[in-house]
């Protein structure tokens, strides 16, 4: 059995899909379906069982055996960069991850988990998986950074696989439940389909991010499970592309619309990553050599998926 925490969420459900595509269906999805809309991410997928996150955590903390576990993909977390409840964030992202890590270490179960490029904070260069480059801007980034630091202490002595992925700007299918935290491509598509002008912040040609397609993210996760490699790795494309490029690809697909530029909100000033670009040196050195989709390629594929029923 493979366990995917956050399996009804964005990246988790895409990992479930990638496993299904390999013929794997003996999957336990762990999630919190308080937001019932997330079920749509699983409705076309095949899993063996579902468990609520709180029930799962109780079983993990009591040391209860959950059966023959081949691996755990830990994607479950509060991923809102605008959530400032530090206690909630540390319980949800840090303590929960530690409990799960130790459960896996005691049983030598491969543990593959979601970290984040938010660990780098407001850098504009050198996105390198090393302490001197890490300075998160928000409590979400801090919770991810602190767990990475915890893992670094354990890695040298670990007898089983531990691998963390610093996800950069992931976009693609199954993110609709994320609301305001969904990707720019998702929001632009929604605005166009609603007959509205698609909106970008002023200066969006200068805001550049490493936009990585979720299908590529899932592929890297599965490759690492097969390779058995451990460590903390950036997971982006290694290319920074502008929000304008995302908009251009969206408009090109729809063959209509023009961008309306809106003022940059004061509340995001100083707390906004204006530039991200993954350094893929460690990922490539680990042996992952497949190419990553460009924004033009990924957004086009995503638009076809979003508009498949129209």
UniProtKB/Swiss-Prot annotation:
Q: Where does substrate bind?
A: 169, 180, 187, 201-204, 209, 272
Q: Please name the pathway.
A: Nucleotide-sugar biosynthesis; ADP-L-glycero-beta-D-manno-heptose biosynthesis; ADP-L-glycero-beta-D-manno-heptose from D-glycero-beta-D-manno-heptose 7-phosphate: step 4/4
What the entry lists under Pfam families is as follows: Epimerase
User: Keywords in UniProt for this one?
Assistant: Carbohydrate metabolism, Isomerase, NADP
Q: What is its EC number?
A: 5.1.3.20
Do you know which InterPro entries this protein is assigned to?
Epimerase_deHydtase, Heptose_epim, NAD(P)-bd_dom_sf
- Which residues of the sequence carry a binding annotation for NADP(+)? 10-11, 31-32, 38, 53, 75-79, 92, 144, 170, 178
Kindly list the GO molecular function terms attached to this UniProt entry: ADP-glyceromanno-heptose 6-epimerase activity; NADP binding
- List the catalytic activities from the record: ADP-D-glycero-beta-D-manno-heptose = ADP-L-glycero-beta-D-manno-heptose
Active site (record annotation)? 140, 178
Its needed co-factors are: NADP(+)
Q: What is written in the cofactor note of this entry?
A: Binds 1 NADP(+) per subunit.
* PANTHER family reported in the protein's UniProt record: ADP-L-GLYCERO-D-MANNO-HEPTOSE-6-EPIMERASE, NUCLEOSIDE-DIPHOSPHATE-SUGAR EPIMERASE
Any domain commentary? Contains a large N-terminal NADP-binding domain, and a smaller C-terminal substrate-binding domain.
Q: Which family does it belong to?
A: Belongs to the NAD(P)-dependent epimerase/dehydratase family. HldD subfamily.
What the protein does comes down to:
Catalyzes the interconversion between ADP-D-glycero-beta-D-manno-heptose and ADP-L-glycero-beta-D-manno-heptose via an epimerization at carbon 6 of the heptose.
According to the record's subunit comment, the protein's assembly and interactions are:
Homopentamer.
Q: What is the protein name for this chain?
A: ADP-L-glycero-D-manno-heptose-6-epimerase
Q: Which source organism? A: Salmonella newport (strain SL254)
């Amino acid at each position: 059995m493979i366990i995917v925490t956050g399996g009804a969420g964005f990246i988790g459900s895409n990992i479930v899909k990638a496993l299904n595509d390999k013929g794997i269906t003996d999957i336990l999805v762990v999630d919190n379906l308080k937001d019932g809309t997330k079920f749509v991410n699983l409705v076309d997928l095949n899993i063996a069982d579902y468990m609520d996150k709180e029930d799962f955590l109780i079983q993990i903390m009591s040391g209860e055996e959950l059966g023959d576990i081949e691996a755990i993909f830990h994607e479950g977390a509060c991923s809102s960069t605008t959530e400032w409840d530090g206690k909630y964030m540390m319980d949800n992202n840090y303590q929960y991850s530690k409990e799960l890590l130790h459960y896996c270490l005691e049983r030598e179960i491969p543990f593959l988990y979601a970290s984040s490029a938010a660990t780098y904070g407001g850098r504009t260069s050198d996105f390198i998986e090393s302490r001197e480059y890490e300075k998160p801007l928000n409590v979400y980034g801090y919770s991810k950074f602190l767990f990475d630091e915890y893992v670094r202490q354990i890695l040298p002595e670990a007898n089983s696989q531990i691998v963390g992925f610093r996800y950069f700007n992931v976009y693609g299918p199954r993110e609709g439940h994320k609301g305001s935290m969904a990707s720019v491509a998702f929001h632009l598509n929604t605005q166009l389909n609603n007959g509205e002008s698609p909106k970008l912040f002023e200066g969006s040609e200068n805001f550049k991010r490493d936009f990585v397609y979720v299908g590529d993210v899932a592929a890297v996760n599965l490759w690492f499970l097969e390779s058995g490699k451990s460590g903390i790795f950036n997971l982006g494309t290694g290319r920074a592309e502008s929000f304008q490029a995302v908009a251009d690809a969206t408009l090109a697909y729809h063959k209509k619309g023009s961008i309306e530029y809106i003022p940059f909100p004061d509340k995001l000033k100083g707390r906004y990553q204006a530039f991200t670009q993954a350094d893929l040196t460690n990922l490539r050195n680990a042996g992952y050599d497949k190419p990553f989709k460009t924004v033009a390629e990924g957004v086009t594929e995503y638009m076809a998926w979003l508009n498949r029923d129209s």
